[in-house]
Amino acid sequence: MIYKVFYQETKERSPRRETTRALYLDIDASSELEGRIAARQLVEENRPEYNIEYIELLSDKLLDYEKETGAFKITEF
């Protein structure tokens, strides 16, 4: 399952929509909830400075759209 993680690069400032970033993770999980938990743990372990805002499971259509925009790249820690 591919998850899109929205985050701020620092926990020091208040979150602002304009500075929200995203990364993509390929998580092997049996349910969407398990995948969200695993994605959060993975990011928090490897990038503790990130302020995670939201984690979204990408549907096939959304994944195709993300690939078309050119912003899609799986992050590996």
UniProtKB/Swiss-Prot annotation:
Gene Ontology terms: cellular component: DNA-directed RNA polymerase complex
Keyword set, alphabetical order: DNA-directed RNA polymerase, Nucleotidyltransferase, Transcription, Transferase
Pfam families membership: RpoY
Top-level taxon in the UniProt lineage: Bacteria
Disulfide bonds: none
Keyword Transferase: yes
One example of a Gene Ontology biological process annotation: DNA-templated transcription
Catalytic activity: RNA(n) + a ribonucleoside 5'-triphosphate = RNA(n+1) + diphosphate
Enzyme Commission code: 2.7.7.6
GO molecular function: DNA binding; DNA-directed RNA polymerase activity
Family from the record: Belongs to the RNA polymerase subunit epsilon family.
Subunit description: RNAP is composed of a core of 2 alpha, a beta and a beta' subunit. The core is associated with a delta subunit, and at least one of epsilon or omega. When a sigma factor is associated with the core the holoenzyme is formed, which can initiate transcription.
Job description of the protein: A non-essential component of RNA polymerase (RNAP).
Designated name of the protein: DNA-directed RNA polymerase subunit epsilon
Protein species of origin: Streptococcus pneumoniae (strain P1031)
Gene, per the UniProt record: rpoY
